[in-house]
Amino acid sequence: NFLSDSKEANRKLAAKSVGKVLGDNIKIFSSITNTLAKDKSINDDWRKLPNPVSARNLSNVVEDSIVDSLVNSVVDSYPKLSHRYFTLKAKWFNKKHLMYWDRNAPLPFQSSKTFTWKEARDIVIEAYSEFNSDIGIIIKKFFDEKWIHSPVLDGKSPGAFAASTVSSVHPFILVNFQGKARDVATLAHELGHGVHQYLAGKNQTHFNASTPLTLAETASVFGEMLTF
């Protein structure tokens, strides 16, 4: 990801390249965006949903008011958190203001240590095992049974996913491992989903094994916290 490259020239080139493609196709992308927005509006009207976010909140089994409170709290914290952080980051880069392509730049003092797949595996298994040995056994099973696909390949979707199938079949983990500390944390995150899905499949039926996003992310973020 050149937008996270340590060299500013590479980050700038990547940002300008993305911007150029978007600019060259602005009418197409505008048409797509407007079409999707109108389709969403029509569906919401048919279903008598009060807000654009209501459909998503309904699927996540959470009230609009709860999400609104969360969003407002985050926005209220901008000055003392994100604004302060980016001001500090600009100073660390000896700049008055950060450019767009500096947002995801690694910090000057950030460790460049990389991890092998085996090292990442051992770190994650140990982290979960120290919390609970039974969960550690399940995590190890994901590696031993090859339920994880980790290489970066042409045509493979970016990002990371825990893909459940049916309750009688184990889930699969899809990551793009490149050896960074963030990749180890991502592996731990997705395995949190994986353990959750594995245990749900063992103890629930096909119709109630799935969970809303609000609950699912609790397990995955907890896995990250165990690891780092």
Where are these regions (language model features)?
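Cation-handling catalytic/transport regions enriched in His/Asp/Glu
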Residues: N1-F228
